[in-house]
């Protein structure tokens, strides 16, 4: 078994094809990485598997040589075929332990929304957790009730692996996540829908690092 890829979750971008619009996902990713995005998850719910594979490969071309990890949402087969760095699973996706047996070298992320779900994670199987939603978010209307900063802290405290916050995170509420113990935070619309994704990413990263305590 080879070591799993390096992974910096500080500023974790989850792509949204619709929000990226005519610019396209790869162009937005390129700009966002220039602004300081440190990990990218390709989330594409529309289209067939071939289209999703083509998108993952296009983003992979953008990320090559940058050191930024490429994570694929849900689709273990596409992650393996493309040679991505990892896959991110939801609670209703394939069991994490089964995926780990199938893909021992992939980074494996899992979405959780309660302390009990976090505490049940096997750190030999799962590398990191996506915790949320922290706030209400329009990009995932079927998400659980918002945790808020206190709920986020409770989930992180129960987790045996690093946690990344997700859901409705914007510059005006980012500072409320300080002291929660998170290893990083995810954004979707804040970067994908921005007129200048590079500037949006840079502003988020500067705010997080510039006022970190």
Curated annotation (Swiss-Prot):
Enzyme category, top tier: transferase
Catalytic activities: 2-[(2R,5Z)-2-carboxy-4-methylthiazol-5(2H)-ylidene]ethyl phosphate + 4-amino-2-methyl-5-(diphosphooxymethyl)pyrimidine + 2 H(+) = thiamine phosphate + CO2 + diphosphate; 2-(2-carboxy-4-methylthiazol-5-yl)ethyl phosphate + 4-amino-2-methyl-5-(diphosphooxymethyl)pyrimidine + 2 H(+) = thiamine phosphate + CO2 + diphosphate; 4-methyl-5-(2-phosphooxyethyl)-thiazole + 4-amino-2-methyl-5-(diphosphooxymethyl)pyrimidine + H(+) = thiamine phosphate + diphosphate
Pathway as given in its UniProt record: Cofactor biosynthesis; thiamine diphosphate biosynthesis; thiamine phosphate from 4-amino-2-methyl-5-diphosphomethylpyrimidine and 4-methyl-5-(2-phosphoethyl)-thiazole: step 1/1
Molecular function in Gene Ontology: magnesium ion binding; thiamine-phosphate diphosphorylase activity
Name assigned to this protein: Thiamine-phosphate synthase
NCBIfam families the UniProt entry points to: thiE
Pfam families: TMP-TENI (PF02581)
EC numbers on record: 2.5.1.3
Details of cofactor binding: Binds 1 Mg(2+) ion per subunit.
Keywords from the UniProt entry: Magnesium, Metal-binding, Thiamine biosynthesis, Transferase
Function: Condenses 4-methyl-5-(beta-hydroxyethyl)thiazole monophosphate (THZ-P) and 2-methyl-4-amino-5-hydroxymethyl pyrimidine pyrophosphate (HMP-PP) to form thiamine monophosphate (TMP).
Alphabetized InterPro entries for the sequence: Aldolase_TIM, ThiamineP_synth_sf, ThiamineP_synth_TenI, TMP_synthase
Family affiliation: Belongs to the thiamine-phosphate synthase family.
Cofactors named for this entry: Mg(2+)
One of the record's GO cellular component terms: cytoplasm
Binding site for 2-[(2R,5Z)-2-carboxy-4-methylthiazol-5(2H)-ylidene]ethyl phosphate: 137-139, 168, 188-189
Organism from which the protein derives: Kineococcus radiotolerans (strain ATCC BAA-149 / DSM 14245 / SRS30216)
GO aspect biological process, one term: thiamine biosynthetic process
List of residues binding 4-amino-2-methyl-5-(diphosphooxymethyl)pyrimidine: 41-45, 73, 111, 140
Highest taxon, organism lineage: Bacteria
Chain segments annotated as transmembrane: none
Positions with a binding annotation for Mg(2+): 74, 93
């Amino acid at each position: 078994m080879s070591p799993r890829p390096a992974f910096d979750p500080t500023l974790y971008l989850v792509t949204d094809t619709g929000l990226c619009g005519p610019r396209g996902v790869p162009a937005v990713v390129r700009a966002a990485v220039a602004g300081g995005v440190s990990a990218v998850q390709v989330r594409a719910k529309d289209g067939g598997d071939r289209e999703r594979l083509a998108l993952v490969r296009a983003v992979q071309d953008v990320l090559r040589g940058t050191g930024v990890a490429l994570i694929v949402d849900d689709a273990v087969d596409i992650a393996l075929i493309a040679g991505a760095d990892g896959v991110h699973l939801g609670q209703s996706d394939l069991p994490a332990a089964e995926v780990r047996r199938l893909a021992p070298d992939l980074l494996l992320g899992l979405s959780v929304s309660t302390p009990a779900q976090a505490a049940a994670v096997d750190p030999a199987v799962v590398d990191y957790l996506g915790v949320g939603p922290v706030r209400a978010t329009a990009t995932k209307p079927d998400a659980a009730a918002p945790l808020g900063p206190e709920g986020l802290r409770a989930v992180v405290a129960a987790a045996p692996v690093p946690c990344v916050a997700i859901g409705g995170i914007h510059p005006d509420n980012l500072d409320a996540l300080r002291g929660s113990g998170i290893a990083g935070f995810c954004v979707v619309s804040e970067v994908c829908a921005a007129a200048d994704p590079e500037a949006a990413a840079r502003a988020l990263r500067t705010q997080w690092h510039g006022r970190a305590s």
